[in-house]
């Protein structure tokens, strides 16, 4: 169902098939360069499946999405844009082995998607794609030196330096969730790293540990976040603890690089001040920085559209950059 194309059409109305991949769910969107989403489709991620099986299921759902857009007489996409969890090397197009996709072994994600869809593919890690979405659509003004954090499935950092997103061979940079906790007091017995407390899964484990009788055994992250937004004191207590632990563990990073802005991304950006205040207070106390010395800390302003715009951002940034050259 994809147009044969050897080069990206140089017009202002490129249509994009956006794919947001993590170990829990996959989001497909049909959008354009302005970030307008016409259709979306979401399904559970076959993260435990081998890579060929993953590609087959992804292709099947993409066909379903495009059948819907074709019924609306929308053009076929010109490019594919991908945000993917794990260690994706944007230079080689290879996803390395990671806990997110346990059966993947140095898989050629970009070339395989190009082969499947016969379209140019632009891809980034979730954290880097999130940073690009902020640069394109965020209400943050001009970004030059900044941190962007994403929290699902694990805590990951994107570093923006002089307006350029940092990449390293193998795409292992930014795995800040692997930081060892400085203290395990009042934490689950097996909590050893930042991922065990401040990632989406870590937050769920912390909530069950702190108040096991308050939550359903199958508590899901959206339900926990909504409880915090509804001012549930048990949820707020857990958020406060996790955010404070996260903030104090940024001390060395902030002192070393002194970013102008620190942006909290998906999904904890939805918590607003419930996450920002304890995080900021803890970072200020741990670092000794305050007032004008501390980086500006803010939540992404993209709201519930963040995953959709994250999916589109790698292609939009690449296409805009090509036209400016």
Give residue ranges: language-model regions.
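Glycine-rich phosphate-binding loop and adjoining helix at the ATP-binding site
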Residues: 46-59, 63, 67-145, 273-285
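Glycine/GP-enriched mid-protein hinge/lid loop-to-helix segment characteristic of carbohydrate kinases
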Residues: 40-42, 49-54, 114-117, 122-127, ...
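Glycine-rich phosphate-binding/hydrolytic loop that grips phosphoryl groups
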Residues: 122-136, 273-325
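N-terminal charged helix/coil linker that caps or initiates catalytic domains
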Residues: 1-17
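Short, acidic, Ser/Thr-enriched surface-loop or helix-capping motifs
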Residues: 32, 90, 160
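Short glycine-aspartate micro-motif
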Residues: 16-20, 77-81, 146-150, 156-158
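Short glycine-rich, Thr/Ser-proximal phosphate-binding strand/loop in the N-terminal lobe
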Residues: 16, 20-54, 95, 175, ...
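Adenine-nucleotide phosphate-binding core of ATP-dependent small-molecule kinases
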Residues: 52-70, 191-197, 202-263, 267-273, ...
């Amino acid at each position: 169902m994809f147009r044969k194309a050897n080069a990206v059409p140089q017009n202002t109305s490129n249509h994009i098939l956006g794919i947001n991949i993590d170990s829990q769910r996959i989001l497909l969107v049909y959008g354009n360069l302005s970030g307008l989403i016409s259709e979306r489709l979401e399904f559970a991620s076959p993260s435990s499946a081998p890579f060929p099986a993953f590609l087959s299921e992804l292709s099947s759902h993409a066909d379903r999405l495009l059948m819907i857009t074709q019924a609306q007489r929308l053009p076929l996409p010109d490019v594919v844009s991908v945000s993917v969890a794990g260690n994706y090397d944007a230079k080689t197009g290879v996803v390395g082995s990671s806990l997110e996709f346990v059966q993947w072994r140095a898989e050629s994600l970009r070339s395989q998607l190009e082969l499947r869809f016969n379209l140019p593919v632009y891809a980034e890690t979730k954290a880097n794609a999130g940073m690009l979405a902020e640069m394109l659509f965020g209400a943050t003004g001009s970004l030059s030196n900044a941190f962007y954090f994403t929290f699902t499935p694990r805590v990951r950092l994107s570093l923006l330096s002089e307006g350029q997103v940092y990449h390293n061979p193998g795409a292992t940079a930014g795995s800040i969730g692997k930081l060892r906790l400085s203290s395990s007091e009042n934490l689950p017995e097996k909590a050893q790293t930042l991922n065990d407390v401040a990632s989406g899964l870590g937050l769920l484990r912390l909530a069950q540990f702190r108040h096991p009788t308050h939550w359903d055994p199958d508590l899901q992250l959206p339900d926990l976040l909504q409880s915090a937004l509804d001012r549930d004191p048990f949820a707020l207590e857990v958020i406060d603890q996790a955010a404070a632990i996260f903030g104090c563990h940024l001390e060395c990073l902030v002192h070393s690089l002194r970013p102008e802005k620190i942006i909290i991304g998906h999904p904890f950006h939805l918590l607003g001040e419930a996450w920002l205040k304890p995080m900021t207070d803890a970072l200020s106390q741990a670092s000794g920085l305050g007032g004008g010395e501390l980086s500006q800390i803010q939540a992404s302003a993209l709201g519930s559209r963040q995953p959709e715009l994250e999916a589109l951002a790698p292609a939009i940034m690449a296409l805009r950059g090509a036209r400016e050259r």
